[in-house]
Amino acid sequence: MNLLDGKKCAESLVAEIARKVAGYTESGLRTPHMTIILVGEHAPSESYVKSKIATSGLAGFESTLLRFPETIRESELLAKIKEVNEDPTTDGLIVQLPLPKHINQQHVINAIAPEKDIDGFHPANFGRMTLGQKAFRPATAYGICKLLQFYEVPVKAKHCVVIGRSNIVGKPISIMLSNDFDIGNATVTLTHIETPRELLLDETRRADIVIVAVGIPGFVTADMVKDGVVLIDVGINRLESGKIVGDVDFENVAQKCSWITPVPGGVGRMTVAALMINTLMAYQNNFNLA
């Protein structure tokens, strides 16, 4: 069993970004700039934003955090997004999710200028990504691809099973791994909550790669996978004891894996690294550097 160490991979990617940024700024260009909008005081969101800001500094970026109370009206939030969209000194914009229930999340995503949508959630970017065109790719799914690429895990012609069909992970990673991207050309099966248990087991037991993102601790058990499987655990679940675990019964499943991501220390770090890659791409686009 080998660990797909997201921390090690992310540090390597961010260091490479920092080298590129140093070259750009030494030539007289301004520093790349990322803006994050945070609504309310959701503890996990606070933690994620803190990580993004810290990593942006390591990448050589400037970052701005715009905080708003949970009571902000949707119209006010959309107006602020429009303001950031029109700011030529901001390359990338993140609106930290989730949002309060009175704000329509899709309205907010759609309001972000596609050229600043470094989360890769805007329909224009998602559509281009689906068609295999250049676009900002959804960060968690992109981070998974970069992790597999970093460790030279074979993907082409492999059978990959994705458990979970969210717009953030399941759908985009299915598309990326099946498309002819820099990493891809896998045969992908997308499963979800309505997939019959027997069918799910039939698929996972034949899979070369299993990616799970369902938010259920220990969902993937040892009897569900074959020896030598590559297992990507996207889950982040806090138990009553306070321990953070993934969607995989790590202790019992790991011994069957050729590669597996730890939780924490796996996909989470890669999500942030992918955001940095997208921010650099937005910056390069602004200066016609790409």
Curated annotation (Swiss-Prot):
Name of this protein: Bifunctional protein FolD 1
Pathway: One-carbon metabolism; tetrahydrofolate interconversion
Alphabetical GO biological process terms: L-histidine biosynthetic process; methionine biosynthetic process; purine nucleotide biosynthetic process; tetrahydrofolate interconversion
Disulphide connectivity of cysteines: none
PANTHER family associated with the record: C-1-TETRAHYDROFOLATE SYNTHASE, CYTOPLASMIC, C-1-TETRAHYDROFOLATE SYNTHASE, CYTOPLASMIC-RELATED
Keyword Transport among UniProt keywords: no
Keywords in alphabetical order: Amino-acid biosynthesis, Histidine biosynthesis, Hydrolase, Methionine biosynthesis, Multifunctional enzyme, NADP, One-carbon metabolism, Oxidoreductase, Purine biosynthesis
Functional note: Catalyzes the oxidation of 5,10-methylenetetrahydrofolate to 5,10-methenyltetrahydrofolate and then the hydrolysis of 5,10-methenyltetrahydrofolate to 10-formyltetrahydrofolate.
Reactions catalysed: (6R)-5,10-methylene-5,6,7,8-tetrahydrofolate + NADP(+) = (6R)-5,10-methenyltetrahydrofolate + NADPH; (6R)-5,10-methenyltetrahydrofolate + H2O = (6R)-10-formyltetrahydrofolate + H(+)
The family this protein is said to belong to: Belongs to the tetrahydrofolate dehydrogenase/cyclohydrolase family.
Residues involved in NADP(+) binding: G164, R165, S166, I193, I236
Hydrolase is among the record's keywords: yes
EC number assigned by the record: 1.5.1.5, 3.5.4.9
Binding partners and assembly: Homodimer.
Any one Pfam family match given in the protein's UniProt record, by short name: THF_DHG_CYH
GO terms, molecular function: methenyltetrahydrofolate cyclohydrolase activity; methylenetetrahydrofolate dehydrogenase (NADP+) activity
UniProt GO cellular component terms: cytosol
